Amino acid sequence: MARNRQPVLKKCRALGIDPVVLGVNKSSKRGPRPNANKKPTEYAVQLREKQKAKFIYNVMEKQFRKIYEEAARKLGVTGLTLIEYLERRLENVVYRLGFAKTRRQARQIVSHGHVAVNGRRVNIASYRVKVGDVISIIENSKNLDIIKTSVEDATVPAWLELDRAAFTGKVLQNPTKDDLDFDLNESLIVEFYSR
């Protein structure tokens, strides 16, 4: 399986992302790039927005394009549907429920089999949850320090519900753009793919 192994701070700096969005509490000591004051082209702005979404959600290009094409086929606004699909990925839901400090840690928790959806163990990070699904940590994994400490500090968005004592969460409704924890201009991504 292909994975992005670039240094997180370096990539955040290049894409203009605050590292706190990724759960990294560091900041780069380096100043702005020498050519940072050059006006980027329209293509460069669109590409950067797409790369930002891919990097934050930890999705490779082929999978991101499949998600976009699926969102484009569905009735409604393509950009908002794309955001909804990315937010409903299991690794992201585990992160948003507070079972992990970062999305990357959430991906590892899912792939190691610590998560169940509706009582069945799921180890596929890209699994898309639906409204009414119950996401829980399996019984043996509830004692893991990583999960315990993460749940204590969790702030859960309005589209999810968390039961801290039982280590379970429920999807109440589909996420919207307002539920994002970072700035994303989805229309630039749609423009990029519709060239």
Stretch-by-stretch model annotation:
Residues 1-97, 124-195:
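Ferredoxin-like alpha/beta domains used as RNA- or RNAP-binding modules
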Residues 100-103, 109-110, 129:
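Short, well-ordered loop/turn sites that connect or cap secondary structure elements
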Residues 104-108, 120-125:
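Short, surface-exposed recognition loops or helix-turn segments adjacent to catalytic cores
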